[in-house]
């Protein structure tokens, strides 16, 4: 999900790349495709059914009461995981502009001492976080919220789960629902839930077309598709599926991106967003990988070069890395196939930590051109295994893989070790540096601000954020291993081999040349006009933009 913070004409964007299948929402809504006119099912007194909108005879958007109940319990517990990852305050929603939060806190606040709430930190340690939260919830009964289905499917992905602890938590959740009369709260908010669903359908008109695209690409139809907005979780989305014989139900559990008019909004298909495409794809990709995992198992060492980064994103092993790589390659394929080739390339560049995503993306082109041979995605898995084998051989089992640092890496290093923000060359460089400094301080980073001329030898060996003009004498030392070289008004990309000239702004994150254990975040303008703003997406290693803010290249 991306957010823009504005200060005068200066913009600093930190794009959070979310775990477990999180992708960005679009800032603009584009009307694409047509859907069946939605029909709303209101929640009546004593009816134990979710608030739901039907987009077709197989596609539903609903507020699942089981998920709502469990997310309320997580909110009441307010653990660090909730605050840092899914708390609505992360997208500017609070009790003043989002009345639903106020209602939840006022109605359920007196019950914070109940067992279910007290168990949340323990359940997070157990692994019930991110996607596991809604997955746990849909195993509960819609009638009384007790355990209604075995945990077997959850254990396939998380074999270390303590089923006795899951049973205990389920009992505590049911007790919480009964004690608080949760159904009363749910019924009283039926109008809010239905407004949320209606706005979702309005914001995402291409949903029916997306379902058709996915079923055609993967060669398999689902019995039903259920999109579940989560009004208490922001920023993250999760995919899941359940099977009952030949019947497959595909789920997408979606956190929201903003609040407008007291209603949560998320753009999951509009404006080139692949939020929903990503989550739906997991329901086809994950089981295909599971059925053929023995083909990929010999290449598990490919996880090692990115293990630390992926574990931070809640992707703890090679199997899940495969899930995410194949799904993210599908996102790019979907964008290209639906008339957004530039966004497809941008999608790939944002996913460089999944370092063989480009290889899989190219393989999908071959798959699409030979559907007479590969009727389903499952049929293509042996070929994908050969693609991964080639990557394994070319990288010596991952030993030769180099992952360049990103804005996210710099922010994490600065959060731990502090940073010095230094500027030189012009008034515009100082103005931009002051904004970067203020942004760091708001993010809890221990930062200093000073002109480049005041940098000490000790400063140079720490994490640096440098805002410079292209005539800076520091550039010669900084650019020895940088992906982009700047010389006056000319910029050369070592990544693409392209040369650009004019009023340009370059952003780079590099290893500190004076101390390999630290990082340097650099913004260089070929003239003062180019330093009018900054886009520092978390996934970026570098970007080149002109002074009109047009993106020329990134990676």
Which residues are covered by each model-predicted region?
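Solvent-exposed alpha-helical segments and adjacent loops
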Residues: 36-84, 141-145, 159, 338-555
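Metalloprotease/metallohydrolase-associated module, dominated by Zn2+-dependent proteases
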Residues: 48-130, 306-367
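Long, mid-chain structured domain cores
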Residues: 110-207
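Active-site recognition of the HExxH zinc-binding catalytic motif
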Residues: 270-291
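Auxiliary, metal-adjacent structural segments of Zn-dependent hydrolase domains
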Residues: 190-248, 450-455, 459-472
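Secretory targeting signatures
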Residues: 1-42
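Active-site scaffold of zinc-dependent metalloenzymes
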Residues: 155-157, 238-270
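Post-HEXXH active-site segment of zinc metalloproteases
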Residues: 287-315
């Amino acid at each position: 999900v991306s957010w823009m913070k504005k200060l005068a004409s200066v913009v600093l964007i930190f794009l959070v790349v979310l775990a477990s299948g999180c992708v960005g929402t679009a800032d603009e809504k584009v009307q694409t495709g047509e859907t069946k006119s939605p029909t709303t099912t209101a929640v009546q007194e004593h009816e134990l059914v979710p608030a739901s909108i039907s987009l077709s005879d197989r596609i539903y958007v609903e507020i699942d009461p089981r998920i709502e109940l469990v997310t309320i319990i997580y909110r009441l517990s307010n653990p660090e995981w909730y605050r840092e990852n899914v708390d609505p305050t992360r997208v500017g929603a609070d009790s003043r502009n989002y009345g639903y939060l106020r209602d939840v806190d006022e109605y359920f606040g007196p019950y914070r001492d109940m067992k279910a709430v007290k168990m949340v930190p323990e359940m997070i340690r157990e692994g019930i976080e991110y996607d596991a939260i809604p997955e746990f919830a849909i195993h509960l009964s819609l009638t009384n919220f007790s355990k209604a289905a075995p945990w077997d499917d959850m254990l396939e992905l998380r074999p270390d789960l303590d089923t006795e602890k899951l049973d205990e938590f389920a009992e505590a959740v049911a007790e919480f629902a009964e004690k608080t009369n949760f159904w009363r709260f749910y019924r009283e908010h039926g109008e809010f839930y239905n407004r949320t669903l209606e706005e979702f359908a309005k914001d995402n008109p291409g949903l029916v077309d997306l379902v058709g695209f996915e079923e055609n690409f993967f060669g398999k139809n689902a019995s039903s598709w259920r999109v579940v907005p989560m009004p208490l979780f922001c920023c993250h989305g999760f995919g899941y599926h359940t099977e009952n014989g030949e019947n497959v139900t595909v789920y997408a559990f979606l956190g929201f991106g903003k609040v407008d008019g007291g209603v949560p909004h998320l753009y999951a298909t509009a404006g080139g967003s692949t939020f929903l495409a990503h989550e739906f794809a997991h329901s086809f990709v994950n089981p295909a990988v599971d059925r053929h995992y023995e083909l990929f198992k010999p290449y598990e060492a490919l996880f090692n070069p990115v293990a630390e980064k992926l574990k931070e994103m809640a992707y703890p092993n090679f199997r899940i890395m495969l899930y995410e790589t194949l799904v993210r390659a599908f996102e790019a394929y979907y964008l290209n196939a639906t008339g957004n080739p530039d966004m497809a390339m941008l999608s790939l560049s944002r996913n460089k930590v999944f370092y063989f995503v480009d290889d899989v993306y190219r393989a999908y082109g071959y798959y699409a051109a030979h559907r007479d041979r590969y009727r389903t995605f499952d049929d293509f898995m042996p070929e994908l295994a050969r693609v991964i084998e080639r990557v394994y051989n070319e990288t010596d089992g991952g030993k030769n893989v180099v992952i360049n640092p990103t804005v996210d890496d710099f922010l994490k290093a600065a959060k731990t070790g502090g940073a010095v923000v230094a500027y030189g060359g012009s008034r515009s460089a100082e103005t931009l540096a002051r904004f970067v400094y203020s942004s760091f301080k708001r993010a809890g980073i221990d930062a200093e601000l000073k002109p480049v001329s005041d940098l000490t030898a000790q400063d140079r060996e720490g994490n640096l954020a440098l805002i410079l003009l292209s005539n800076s004498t520091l550039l010669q030392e900084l650019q020895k291993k940088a992906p982009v070289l700047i010389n006056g008004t000319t910029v050369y990309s070592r990544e693409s081999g392209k040369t650009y000239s004019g009023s340009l702004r370059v952003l780079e994150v590099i290893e500190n040349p004076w101390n390999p254990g630290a990082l340097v975040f650099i913004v260089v303008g070929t003239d003062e006009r180019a330093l009018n703003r900054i886009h520092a997406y978390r996934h970026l290693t570098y970007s080149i933009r002109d002074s009109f803010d047009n993106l020329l290249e990134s990676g």
